[in-house]
Design a protein with these regions (language model features):
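A short gly/proline-enriched turn/hairpin at secondary-structure junctions
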Residues: 35-49
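Residue-level signal for the nucleotide or nucleotide-sugar donor/cofactor binding architecture
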Residues: 6, 21, 49
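A beta-strand edge to alpha-helix "cap/lid" segment located at domain peripheries
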Residues: 1-10, 55-138
Length: 138
């Protein structure tokens, strides 16, 4: 489950790029037919198809940050999927309060590229969606 693979390394690099506002660097992991799913209740909820739509979505979302980061805490590989458990701590440009929480992103890979990028409001939801249990004791 927790292991280093080419996909987990690519994701680690992608989040590093996102945190320094390098959108093009973040986009390197995606296949041309990428599908982005952001859940209801999130500021930019919806489904986005293709590189340009996903790039615009990510650029708009990242553009709201005044400061902060999305820090991967764990990468869990399950067949063609990688669950990324994240600690998100950001302050948006239009707020003084910090957003601080944990969520789960799930990436589905084909031929070394992500074909789907789905976010879950709760890490456990991401794990359940791919059918794995979090066996780590916190």
């Amino acid at each position: 489950m927790d292991k280093i693979t080419p996909e987990t390394e690519a994701l680690r690099e992608a989040y590093e790029a996102l945190n320094r506002n390098d959108i093009q660097g973040f986009m390197k992991i995606f296949a041309p037919d990428i599908e982005r799913i952001e859940p209801p209740g999130f500021p930019m909820a919806g489904t986005y198809h293709g590189l340009e739509a996903v790039k615009e979505h990510v650029s708009q979302g990242r553009g709201t940050w005044a400061e902060g980061a999305c820090e991967p805490e764990r990468f869990i590989v399950a067949d063609d999927k990688v669950v990324v458990l994240l600690h998100v701590r950001v302050r948006r440009k239009d707020h003084t309060d910090w957003i601080d929480g944990r969520l789960g992103d799930v990436y589905t890979f084909r031929d070394g590229k992500a074909i789907q990028f789905r976010t879950f409001a709760e890490p456990q939801e991401a794990l359940e969606w791919v059918g794995v249990e979090d066996s780590r004791e916190d």
